[in-house]
Every structure is written in C-alpha cells, then in structure tokens.
UniProtKB/Swiss-Prot annotation:
The gene is pgi. It catalyses: alpha-D-glucose 6-phosphate = beta-D-fructose 6-phosphate. It comes from Streptomyces griseus subsp. griseus (strain JCM 4626 / CBS 651.72 / NBRC 13350 / KCC S-0626 / ISP 5235). It comes from the Bacteria. This is Glucose-6-phosphate isomerase. One of its GO terms (cellular component) is cytosol. GO terms for molecular function: carbohydrate derivative binding; glucose-6-phosphate isomerase activity; monosaccharide binding. The keyword Cytoplasm applies. PANTHER family: GLUCOSE-6-PHOSPHATE ISOMERASE.
C-alpha cells in the first residue's frame, strides 16, 4: 500500500472500534472479570516452547482480544512478517533486509537476500567461531609470551555490548569458570581501567566488536587497550595479532589496527546491532559457554521464530504481547512498561530490552516520513525481584500511573547452588506469585477494615488493584530458554512497530549527538578546528566552565 492510499492508523475502522470498546469498558475490574469467567486463569494462557504465558491478569475481554487481532490484520502485521522472513528490505530508510532470524536458521534452510541464500555464510561464520572458541577454551590459543588466554575483554558499544554482556550474566552458571570475561563499552576511561587493572596482559585477549571498525567509542577503547597491552608486555606491534580479534566487516581497518584478518569474524548489513548477539558479536559468549550451548541458544531463538511465523493469531505469543502493549499505550495512555525478572541471573535482561524496544520503536514519524498522531514505543524499565519490591513497587501498587508489567520466573533454580541457597528459591517464587496477585486484585477498604485497621489509616492501606501483568514461567533457565525469551520480545517489538507503521529497524536518533560531540571535543581540548560560535549560549557557558575546571 502506497503512502497516498494508506488510511492513517487512528482513522481506521478497527482503531475506532477499539476506542469505542475502551469507552464501553470504562474502568474494568479484574475481580469482576475473574468472577464472570471462572476458568479465566487457565483459559488466558499460551504455551510456546518452554515458556508458559499467563495473560489472565490483563484488562481485556474476549472482545478486546478479537478487536486487537482485527487491528493487527488491518495494519498488515502478517504481511510485513512474511516480507521480513523472505528477506525483503523492510528497513526502508536504510534500504536493508531485516534477517536476524537467519542467524539461527538450521543449515538446510534457505533464506535469500538479493537472490543469494545467506544461510551457508551464517553457518560458515558459526563454524569458524566454534573452532576459535575451542582453541581458547582448551588452552591451545596462546598469547605473545606463550601463555594460554585466561581473560577475555569484549570491547563494543550498544548492540555490540548489551547483548553479549546480558547473555553472559544470564548463562553465567553454564560458563567455564576458569575464564574471566569482562565487557567494556563506555568511552569513560574508567570503564577500561577497571576492566584490566588486575589482569595479566600476557593472558588477556581483546575482542573488538565494530561492524565498520570506526565506531568512535569502541576504537578509542581498543586503541587504549592496545597501548596498555604493549606497554605492560614491553613489546612491539607484532604482539597485537595474538591478543586481539575483530568482529567486523572492514578488513582494511582491522589489518591497519594490527589484527590478523584471519581472526576477523564477519556479519552482515541485514543484521541490526540490537539484534546481533547471536551472530559473530556473540563470540565472547561462545568462548564462555562453549559452542554446543551457544547452538542450544540458537535453537531456542529458532523455535520462537517458527512459532511467530506459523502460529494462528489466537495462539501467537509475540503477537499477543505486542497487541497488549498497543492496548495499554494507545487506549490507556500508559507511558512505560516494566519487565521484572525473578532471577538474579537476569540482572541485565531489562537493560538489554531497553535498547531492543526503545531504539526500535522510539520513533515519531511513520515509514513514509509523516508525523504520527499516536503513542509509539514505551519507556522500558525494571530490575530483578525481589529488589524492586523494596524500591519502586510502591508506585506501581499505589501510585497514579498505569504500568503494565511482565513477570519472568523459573520453577527450578540453577543447578550449581548450594543446598541452602536452593531452598531459598521457594521464597523467591512465593514473592513472584504474590506480587502479580496483589497487583491484580489489590485490597478493598472493606478488607482493610475487617482487619481492625483504624479508619484514618484505611485509605493508606487500601490497594486499588487492576494493575495488568503478564506472567512468563519456565521450568529452568537454560541457553535455549534465553533464546526463546529474546525472540519472544524481538517479535513483540516487530508487531508493535508494524501496527504503528514505523520503521523499527533504523536508529537515526543516535546520530545527531555523535556529530555534535565531534565538533565540541576540540573546544574542550583546545586543539582548535571548531567554531565556538556554533554553540548555543548554554552549551558555550558549560564548555567554558569545563575548561576552567580543567585548568585550560
């Protein structure tokens, strides 16, 4: 459908029907919805792979879900999904295909970009990664002095850091504990300093992740890491090849840096940064958990990819989650979405989802460049339970904002905990189930009074309830389950972007600040080459204050 013939989203009959339905619902009460539908707790569930999804505690009825599915059909979600899986260039502003799904396709799959099957190239890189990972894990890969590598420092930023750093924390119990793995992303020199300060350079390998090998933060950190290595080893440039590998496509720049291009692992333009950690960007993770477990993770991704591609709308988990997000964002004016994993190993999971969701759907123009008249991506936030319960849950329970939330938990703890720590898992999960119940059903003034609470305190101890949550429960946290979870959220984000008619796969919003930083840096250092007159009065005054504080 071309721009001239496309009806604006909020003018479609399906949107109008949802708006009318929302008005008729008024202020839905979950207590009443459950009372009217005794089997709601089992009827409103889905199963995808190892994931059990309970969406019964949402402010929806069968009619709501039907109307939301009609909106998805009218906005071409299924058609755009098929175009993505076919390798069409649905990232229109960059004229690129969007094929992170090809990164986890089986060897015999056929996925074409510009008439070429990309799956053999994907598996060639995976095989190369596996060979390298086994060399490091077995001690065959040695540094310049002949010592085996024991420390790996991954240097990247954005998708080249958040994904592998998150997955390493999630799968820490599956890692080789004899290897130390650290991640550096911030151009603040303190990040690199703390990462290497107690490492033996003779036993340290740096993994430099930059598709173009020109990302300013990454190359600045990589250059400083190279200086540290050569200074500490008191050796020349030839040592670099034994202590640095590259995740890049720019062989010329990689070789210029001193890295042997035989140790360059490539990926492709059709892989967006925030969708890339299951590509070569995941090399450091593969070294940590081993190639077999990395492939288990890819199989988990692929399982949900196939579910998203083939499951009917009524049973399609990513479609459902995406539609629920549209329901709250566009018809309840919810501004944020909390992701609350009840697993310490998922401590970086929500930060990863922040980039996945907010960089994808933080857009204010549609695919045709026209301003949108509806809310798009939410603010995504959250930390692991039970910590959040003693921090911000107060606002969710008794504040004035509607904050839909996802609760993620596991029936079994990780396998290597001490017996006493394993016993704590039931307490953790008791909190997990209690919070969704409390958020949904609250506590009425009558229930508070029945406990003998003084009347003046009754309003303070009343819980309104009706806070919507999705519960995602799995047997245990494994590499496959991690892949399933990430793919679930990837495709949820896709669904919402398709409905909102935005390009979920570009990120022009990160560019302006980078351009301005290049102009401002010479003003800070006094190296010249910049015109202070280009600055607004506030920024100019701040630059002057900075220079004064630095004694310049």
């Amino acid at each position: 459908m071309n721009a001239a013939s496309r009806t604006k989203l909020n003018q479609t009959p399906e949107w109008t029907a949802l708006a009318k339905h929302r008005e008729e619902l008024g202020a839905p009460r979950l207590r009443e919805l459950f009372a009217r539908q005794p089997d709601r707790g089992t009827a409103y569930t889905l199963r995808v792979g190892d994931l059990h999804l309970d969406y019964s505690k949402h402010l929806v009825t069968d009619e709501t879900l039907r109307l939301l599915r009609e909106l998805a059909a009218a906005t071409g979600v299924a058609e755009l999904r098929e175009a993505m899986f076919r390798g069409e260039k649905i990232n229109t502003t960059e004229d690129r295909a969007v094929l992170h799904t090809a990164l986890r396709a089986p060897r015999d799959a056929v996925v074409e970009v510009d008439g070429e099957n990309v799956v053999p190239a994907v598996h060639a890189v995976l095989d190369k990664m596996a060979g390298f990972a086994e060399k490091v894990r077995s001690g065959q890969w040695t540094g310049h002095t002949g010592k085996p590598v024991k420390n790996i420092v991954n240097i990247g930023i954005g998708g080249s850091d958040l994904g592998p750093a998150m997955a390493y924390e999630v799968l820490r119990s599956f890692t080789d504990r004899d290897l130390t793995l650290r991640f550096v992303s911030n151009v603040d020199g303190a990040d690199l300093h703390e990462a290497v300060r107690d490492l033996d350079p003779a036993e340290t390998l740096f993994v430099i992740a930059s598709k173009t090998f020109t990302t300013i933060e990454t190359i600045t950190n990589a250059t400083s890491a190279r200086d540290w290595l050569l200074t500490e080893l008191r050796t020349g440039q030839d040592a670099v090849a034994k202590h640095f590998v590259a995740l890049s496509t720019n062989a010329e720049k990689v070789e210029e840096f001193g890295i042997d291009t035989a140790n360059m692992f490539e990926f492709w333009d059709w892989v967006g940064g925030r969708y890339s950690y299951d590509s070569a960007i995941g090399l450091s993770l593969m070294v940590a958990i081993g190639p077999d477990r990395f492939r288990e993770m890819l199989e988990g991704f692929h399982l949900v990819d196939e579910h998203f591609r083939t499951a009917p709308p009524e049973e399609n988990a990513p479609l459902l989650l995406g539609l629920l997000g549209v329901w709250y964002g566009n018809f309840f004016d919810a501004q944020s979405h909390a992701v609350l994993p009840y697993s310490h190993y998922l401590s970086k999971f929500t930060a990863y989802l922040q980039q996945l969701d907010m960089e994808s759907n933080g857009k204010s123009v549609d695919r045709d460049g026209n301003p949108v008249d509806w809310q798009t991506g939410p603010v995504v936030w959250g930390t692991p339970g039970t910590n959040g319960q003693h921090a911000y849950y107060q606002l969710i329970h008794q504040g004035t904002k509607l904050i839909p939330a996802d609760f993620i938990g596991f029936a079994a703890p990780v396998h290597d905990l001490l017996p006493g720590l394993i016993a704590q898992h039931d307490l953790l999960m008791a909190n997990f189930f209690a919070q969704t119940q409390a958020l949904a059903f609250g506590k009425t003034p009558e229930e508070v009074r029945a406990e003998g609470v003084p009347e003046e305190l009754v309003p303070h101890k009343t819980f309104r309830g009706n806070h919507p949550t999705t519960t995602i429960l799995a047997d245990k946290l494994t590499p496959s389950v991690l892949g399933q979870l990430i793919a679930l959220y990837e495709h949820k984000v896709f669904v919402q972007g398709a409905i909102w008619n935005i390009d979920s796969f570009d990120q022009w919003g990160v560019e302006l600040g980078k351009v301005l930083a290049k102009k401002i840096e010479p003003l800070l250092t006094g190296d010249g080459g910049a015109d202070a007159g280009e600055l607004d009065s506030s920024t100019a005054a701040l630059v002057d204050a900075y220079r004064t504080l630095r004694g310049r």
